[in-house]
Amino acid sequence: MCEARSSFYNRAKQIELLSLQASSPPTSPGLAVIAADMQEVDAVIARRLASGVPLVGQVSHYIIGAGGKRLRPALLLLTCGALGYQGSQRFNMAAVVEFIHTATLLHDDVVDGSALRRGSATANETFGNPASVLVGDFLYSRAFQMMVDAKDMRIMEVLADATNVIAEGEVLQLMNMHDATLDSAGYLHVIRSKTAKLFEASARAGAILAGASPSLEQACADY
């Protein structure tokens, strides 16, 4: 038993080290303008993944380092840039939306029983379902810690609402899984909740950081 556990943790540590050594997600030409900002976000992510519980760091680094385009953080940064906000809080909030997104992926893969994501073994396949669920919970709670640090109730309201809507979307998808009567309106409602809501919240949070008017904030969210 002890030998098997030691082998598991050694393997997990190797995975964590490989993830930390991996380069940041490739930047498309359209996102080159925020390449330096994205490096700052990656630094915040690495710093705020710190935990005194080794398995938390191992699973977190594994899923964060597995690739992805960081589109939600990019949207927040681009909104801030378009509205003239250059404060450092944009890096923290960009990391927050990435943590929320990553938590949904961890939970999603457990619910779906997925073995692969982006061509690699999922976290639940590598570490097991219990670890994936609990580390997803850690990422949610860390995201909310960071929101509290920002001391902006409006941003907390927007991102808390988005997190709630995403969870409802996941439950709706589960309920509709074998429903042959589901129409396009019902399907669109699910994907608006599961996917579009966090994009909307990312743009809205960027506008709030920039001190945009309510009408401009809404325009960014609608976009």
What are the language-model segments listed below?
Residues P25-P26, V33-A35, Q39-E40, A46-Y223:
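Mg2+-dependent prenyl diphosphate-binding active-site environment of isoprenoid biosynthetic enzymes
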Residues I15-L20:
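Intrinsically disordered, low-complexity activation-like regions
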